[in-house]
Regions:
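Short terminal targeting/anchoring segments
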Residues: 1-32
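Generic intrinsically disordered, low-complexity segments enriched for polar/acidic and small residues
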Residues: 8, 13-14, 152, 159, ...
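Long, low-hydrophobicity, acidic/polar, solvent-exposed interaction domains
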Residues: 23-189
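Single conserved hydrophobic/aromatic residue that forms the stacking wall/gate
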Residues: 188-197
């Protein structure tokens, strides 16, 4: 039996399967995670400066150990971040909150901690993240408008413009310090934030 063409057939089948097979790509969140630091002792954070958000396996939201609806989370986060309850060097000059001594000192010291169960629905997890990012963006927009009243754009618009590859280098150089100044004030969400380099 002549088997000379068997290699050709096997090669053609291999080519056929390589061409017709689709390769699935993983989908997920595009987040920049902070690099590992060589700090041995963790920083001391006052309990009142931590805003804890927990999503359990039943998709129930607990904020500061109290049940809350997702649509109420943004306002609660803004209230916490903008409290400005610090005294002396911890005081916040730009905060417009209630200055409650039992809540955060200032946005630079405030930390939002998001924890979820493994069985939490992905869409609920994303909805909670979106509300927390929106709370930061509300405050960033307000502070950006206060510091740059003649610019005529919000922080989010300026950030989008800075990230756009079509934006000229001179415009990026102009936006960079303005964006960085606001970002420094509102950085301690446990979700990664944009770094302007």
């Amino acid at each position: 039996v002549n088997a000379g063409s068997m290699a050709d057939i096997a090669f053609l089948l291999l080519i056929f399967f390589l061409v017709t097979t689709t390769i699935e790509t993983d989908s997920g969140l595009n987040r920049k995670i902070p690099p590992m630091e060589d700090i041995i002792d963790p920083p001391i954070i006052k309990e009142r400066n931590i805003f804890t958000v927990v999503v359990n396996k039943n998709n129930d939201l607990l904020v500061e150990e109290k049940p809350m609806q997702i649509d109420e989370l943004r306002e609660a986060a803004v209230t916490f971040l903008d409290n400005g309850g610090g005294k002396g060097e911890d005081a916040c000059s730009f905060c417009q909150g209630e200055r409650d001594p039992n809540s955060s000192d200032n946005p630079e010291k405030a930390v939002i901690s998001l924890k979820n169960d493994r069985e939490t629905d992905y869409k609920v997890y994303i909805a909670v993240q979106n509300e927390l990012v929106a709370a930061y963006n509300i405050l960033r927009n307000r502070e950006f408008a206060r510091l740059n009243p003649n610019l005529g754009m919000s922080f989010v618009e300026a950030d989008r413009k800075y990230s756009d590859p079509r934006t000229s280098l001179s415009q990026k150089e102009s936006l960079k310090p303005k964006l960085s100044e606001v970002t420094v004030s509102y950085t301690h969400l446990t979700l990664p934030t944009t770094e302007y380099v």
